[in-house]
Amino acid sequence: MILRISLIFAALILASCAPTPQVKQIPRVQAQPAVISTGNEDLTSMTTMRQIVARVEPIGEQICRDTDRVSNCDFKIQVDTSTPDVVNAYQTLEKDGRPLVIFSIGLLKAARNTDEVAFVLGHEMAHHIAGHIQQRRGSAGLGGLILGGLIAYSGGSAQNVDSAFDLGAAVGSRVYSKDHELQADEIGTLITYYAGYDPVRGSKFFTRIPDPGDKFLGSHPPNAARIDRVNRTMARVR
């Protein structure tokens, strides 16, 4: 019986990952003309950041509306200046469900050109467009309920059930994290390209960050796999 429930647990988790949303091809001339990044821009300048956002955000929001997977496509982009030594960007939701993308000032310092900043922004917007937060929460809840249920069914104590729930939730939330990153790279590539930036050049940011390798239940795929996804996506649209 426990084996049967375990198989059901695995099947439900496997079914919880949605495919990459189909993105309508946007003629680049209707989006933004190409930007030639000199690499000499002050990427920590809010003026530069506003210029990037002014190009990327409308494209991301248009793709968000076209894919129709999430209801709120009104993005808000912020820069966190309190973390100068942290290189990070992430997407979350405000209390009202509005998608929020936050850059650390450390990431802007680490970037070498506007293509890299635009690519990171497109990638983070893509997480929302693909509904990754909702999928991760669903997988976490499902993993917790089923693994906790397994322990309860086998006569485990309340403490053991709680521990199993936490473990199941942690595993469930990570099952498709690598796929989510690759999906975001693919959609983010299109956003970056249609905004007039060079996503291939932008993805070179991956060559300067630690490579997570191909760890089981790791949160990110190998950097080489991410760069390959960008290149293959661009081969379809060029």
Predicted regions and their residues:
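Post-HEXXH active-site segment of zinc metalloproteases
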Residues: 132-163
